[in-house]
From Swiss-Prot:
Single Gene Ontology BP annotation: modification-dependent protein catabolic process
Role played: Component of the proteasome core, a large protease complex with broad specificity involved in protein degradation.
Annotated protein name in UniProt: Proteasome subunit beta
Location within or outside the cell: Cytoplasm
Amino acid sequence: MAGRVREVSHSSDQSGRLPAAFLRPGSSSFTDFVREYSPEILPATRTLPAAAALPGGGPGAGEPPHATTIVALVFADGVVMAGDRRATAGPMIAQRDIQKVFQTDEHSCAGIAGTAGLAVEMIRLFQVELEHFEKLEGTLMSFEGKANRLSTMIRANLGMAMQGLAVVPLFAGYDLDAGRGRIVGYDITGGRSEEHDHHTVGSGSLFARGSLKKLYRPGMSEAETVRVALEALWDAADDDSATGGPDLLRKIWPVVGVTTAEGYRRVPDAELEPVVEAVVAGRRGNPGGNPGISAVHGDGGN
């Protein structure tokens, strides 16, 4: 840290004024600025050492924690995103209450799957990127602009991904120009695709997607959409050991975010608890079975 301070001070003049790079007009991208001024602190510039294993000899030693299942669903007024709370390192549970869904600005959010530490760092940098743009331009970045900017950041991580440290976010938000909720999925190269109705990423995504295909329907209310998201995470946890289900003993619930024209809000745990209990009650006696449309929507399947 001391060396870093000395490096910055050497680039300033004796009057204590900011370096010229801070005052020169240029891109409204914070990442572009850092790449020009101090590129070594960007995650994309790092490389793994020849021996990357971490100390320790137990199961999962040498493996970084991985975040797993994220689901996103469009509903009548916007979009819902939910993520389980488990992080794994090999066969071990590394963390039981990790947060995988983050607000990125007033009208968008992102969920993370893949290498947890790098994924969280990427989303934090993305948050700063959007805030920096807003301060310089005096307006929010468009939904398309945000999706493209995140794509560029994922592509910059390709070197780490090819070494086994992939980051695969899921981006969603309310498009103020289009007046609707939207979901964008990515691959490890930064390739992006518009996802319609719903999408899932992570190790349990196959099982969550199967659940969503049965339970999702267009035009659902916010409450129905939250319930369907929790049902999908339950199905993922039921078949994927890296996805954590609701922890009733510790009262650890999935993180659920809702984004509408009014903005983003995280659904409070107190609001989620009765919904989780309803999901558990609906699966009692048939934990692996589908609760059915009528159980979720309360309409007898009509």
